[in-house]
Amino acid sequence: MRCLPVFIILLLLIPSAPSVDAQPTTKDDVPLASLHDNAKRALQMFWNKRDCCPAKLLCCNP
């Protein structure tokens, strides 16, 4: 009988998995891969512009 309270506490600590998505997706949701691609693109543009100078006009992307 002493183990019963411990067993109940352990059951309460186990997170239950939802059977359906807790938050439905909307048209505003952006996949994580898209955010990752946008971050990579922004960093690439930053690195390209960092080395840009009047002597290297061909390296400058508008």
Swiss-Prot record:
Residues 23-48 form a propeptide. It is found in: Secreted. Its main location: secreted. The keyword Iron does not apply. Contains 2 disulfide bonds that can be either 'C1-C3, C2-C4' or 'C1-C4, C2-C3', since these disulfide connectivities have been observed for conotoxins with cysteine framework V (for examples, see AC P0DQQ7 and AC P81755). GO terms for molecular function: sodium channel inhibitor activity; toxin activity. One of its GO terms (biological process) is envenomation resulting in negative regulation of voltage-gated sodium channel activity in another organism. Expressed by the venom duct. Residues 1-22 form the signal peptide. Keywords: Cleavage on pair of basic residues, Disulfide bond, Ion channel impairing toxin, Neurotoxin, Secreted, Signal, Toxin, Voltage-gated sodium channel impairing toxin. The keyword Secreted applies. InterPro entries: T-conotoxin. It comes from the Eukaryota. The cysteine framework is V (CC-CC). Belongs to the conotoxin T superfamily. This is Mu-conotoxin Lt5d.
